Amino acid sequence: MRTVLLVLALSAASAYGQDAGKEIQRYREMVAEGSPAELFELEGETLWKKPQGPKNVSLEKCNLGKGPGVVKGAYAGLPRYFKDADRVMDLETRLLYCMTTLQGRTREEVTKRAFGNADHPSEMESLSAYVAGQSRGIKMAPGVSHPKEKQSIELGRALYFHRVGAWDFSCATCHGDEGKRIRMQELPVLYKPAAARSTAATWPAYRVSTSSFVTLQWRMNDCFRQMRTPEPTFGSETTVALIHFISATGAGATYNGPGNKR
């Protein structure tokens, strides 16, 4: 009898999980129509063209990897190695570089409010929305050939499985097994191409539950916070490497963001 009850319970849980998954997908499709992310894209375009900083220049000569000022398809090619900075950069790290070198602003000024909220979105978030949106429909192809790109991806892979902090958590603790959820939120297994493609193709994103636009640097930072470890420096080698590993694993996906998240 106990065996029968256990089988019934497991079957019910499985059915519930499948139904919940369908409802979550339906919900995402509904909120994708007329996404508020479009408003952040528009604001980001304004900021891209706005003269700022001690040098009073815009970001229109910022080289995101496709040449000075070229935003079309740039996000799809990130993270990648930049010779002028001699390091691998993701979108936000590169924007920070351009703000400091082209506009003459300080790192402290730019990163003071790198992450905004519903009432006060950050400049970095809006710029990320604009640049990312210019890769819509383009296949994701982050840099993977330069020696420092290869090092970055391997570092990201090692960090993904590295346990740390008081709770002895790693990224794989939550994102390591199929079918895991936190409440109604599915936890994709990001070291597998299928899940990584879905993630790479939709970030950055508008977060419905907080009415705010969030970026991958924010996502990495918040994961470290939830693991009860010190939050990383904005644009650190650690966060860029993790983003690079996930992006490289998900290479080939057609970018369809900025997306919508719970």
Q: What do these predicted ranges mean?
A:
Residues 39-40, 151:
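An amphipathic alpha-helix/helix-turn recognition signal
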Residues 18-39, 49-126, 136-137, 162-262:
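Electron-transfer interface patches adjacent to heme c in soluble/periplasmic c-type cytochromes
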Residues 8-17:
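Hydrophobic h-region of N-terminal signal peptides that target proteins for export
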Residues 138-155:
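Solvent-exposed, charged amphipathic helical/linker segments at domain boundaries
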Residues 1-7:
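Sec-dependent signal peptide recognition
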Residues 127-131, 143-144:
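Hydrophobic, well-structured mid-protein blocks that either form specific transmembrane helices
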Residues 159:
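Secondary-shell segments that build the walls of catalytic and ion/ligand-binding clefts
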